[in-house]
Amino acid sequence: MQDKPVIVFISTVYPSQHSLLCSHLRANGLADSWFMTMPGHVKLHGPQCDHLLEFQPDGAISGPQSYYYSSKVERSARIGRGLLKALQAFEKRQGRRVDLVVAHSLWGAPNWLYDEIDAAIISYIEFPSFLAHGWDPAFPPDPSQRQADRNMEMLHFHQALRSDLSIVPSAYARSLFPPVLQERIAVQFEGFDIRPQPLKTGTGLPEDPRFTIGFSARDLSTAKGFETFLRLVDRMVEQGDGAQTRFVAIGDAAPNVSYGYEKQWLERRYPGQDLNLRDHFLRLYPRAQVVEFPGRLPYAEFSRLLASVDLFLYPLRHGVANWGLMEILARGGCVLGSNWGFVPELVQHDINGMLLPDHDQAWLDAIRALRADPGRRARYAEAAIRTGQRFHISQVAPRYMDLFRLAMARRRCTAPARLALS
């Protein structure tokens, strides 16, 4: 290995989980780091990023594969074979070996790299399967979807077994794996570069004197707790708490959500109607019509809107980690969160927020108490900013480098001798 390790991050998605880390390691001289992704991303982002590499999957990875029940395996094979060729070509072009590959488990599937390259391999796995992740029982998968989910589970168990190290974003995510595999899995949440903005000041938004209660997620899905938020708003309005209160739900209301099966349920429940989950829930909770839905926003506008919120509700149902929660905390948002899943790993009760059980009255009581206690909200906000600082990329990068060195050491100890590059 060279003094400065050659590290290649891999994902068909860019920007993605480790693109900021890749750039940070390179800019600070910690690694000769590169990001390998699809040609379209290289063409789009290449002028602003000098360390992008392209690879071409061995066939189409979007759309149906040859057999539904093995589609994820087939798609991963196409990605893996394309990666192998691209990595070998990169090593030949550079005249040196890659020391470490850090691959997204599905969008950089490393299953076809084992024993084919000299580099240590780290697999980044969000969660082992949708079965382990969980879904809202009101919107269940079809039997065929449940069976096809075994593809994902098999790929991830294989990676956890064969990779020099696997990384997951939370201890909760690691707990979803069989105990026999957990010792091969490290926990490390991503690094961020989020700059706090004083709440309610300098947001660039029109002044609104009302107390603002917010919900924020990439998509407005049941997994993120969107239904719970609307149900709580409905009850608050019914009980007279809606006066002088502004409610806002930030996120994409499109029917196709990331971690659930709501879209197909909506199509079957409302055939021929262009309805999304928001429309459905507003029929169930009509008093929640007071909620503002700004939709998916450009990042700068999203940041300003977050800064205008006095109290965030984060009633997560299912999930293993979330950028959205860190976006709130790092800016000093006051958070009421679920006391299960990964949330307690970021929110400490009565320190940088509050953790609540799955009981509506507990949430309503906490909302009223915090609304009446600006000093407590300010204390939570200050602690939340410190939480965000702990996950700033400058603080997280050394932890990642420790894990990377561990994986490379394991590779040196266990790999069979291989011929040097000519």
Annotate each language-model stretch with its function.
Residues 60-69, 122-154, 257-268:
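Acceptor-binding helix/loop patch of EC 2.4 sugar-transfer enzymes
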Residues 145-201, 206-208, 212:
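Donor nucleotide-sugar binding/catalytic pocket of nucleotide-sugar-dependent glycosyltransferases
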Residues 204-224, 230-235, 247-248:
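Conserved donor-binding/catalytic core segment of Leloir-type glycosyltransferases
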Residues 259-300:
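Nucleotide-activated donor-binding/catalytic signature segment of Leloir-type glycosyltransferases, i.e.
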Residues 349-350, 354-360, 369-374:
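Conserved acidic donor-binding segment of nucleotide-sugar-dependent glycosyltransferases
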